[in-house]
């Protein structure tokens, strides 16, 4: 039997980063491995040197296809398979986590509001609001 591995990655950031994918048919028991694609079609390489390497970093069941099919989240690398592609922002996040992983992250949420006069649609300042 076989199953489908849907490789997913983030493409070049020009004009904006998008999710790309391609499917590989694997025999039962085979694990998804390193794969590649033509980076010139995703603004990640020039036509004369267009190979980009996909390295799997996470896999999970495919919720759309079901069965034994899986989604394979990938990072992009240059052809030496060691150097992250310049558009691989996950590599930067991984490096930061490795460096600062022993620290506890703190998050601060801020919600801003603007008071607008319903007649003139001008912004109301605090002294104006107090006089209303």
Question: Which residues fall in each region the model found?
Answer:
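Acidic-residue sensor for enzyme active/binding pockets
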Residues: 75, 110-112
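Acidic/polar, glycine-rich intrinsically disordered N-terminal extensions of enzymes
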Residues: 1-100
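Short, conserved secondary-structure transition motifs
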Residues: 112-120
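Flexible, glycine/charged-enriched surface loops at secondary-structure junctions
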Residues: 101-110
């Amino acid at each position: 039997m076989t199953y489908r591995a849907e490789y997913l990655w983030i493409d070049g950031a020009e004009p904006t980063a998008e999710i790309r994918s391609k499917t590989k048919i694997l025999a039962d028991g085979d694990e998804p491995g390193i794969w590649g694609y033509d980076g010139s079609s995703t603004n990640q390489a020039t036509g004369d040197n267009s190979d980009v390497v996909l390295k799997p970093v996470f896999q999970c069941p495919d919720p759309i296809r079901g069965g034994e099919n899986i989604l394979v989240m990938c990072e992009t690398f240059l052809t030496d398979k060691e150097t992250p592609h310049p558009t691989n922002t996950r590599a930067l996040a991984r490096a930061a986590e490795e460096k600062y992983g022993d620290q506890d992250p703190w998050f601060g949420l801020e919600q801003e509001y603007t008071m607008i006069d319903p007649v003139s649609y001008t912004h109301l300042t605090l002294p104006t609001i107090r006089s209303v």
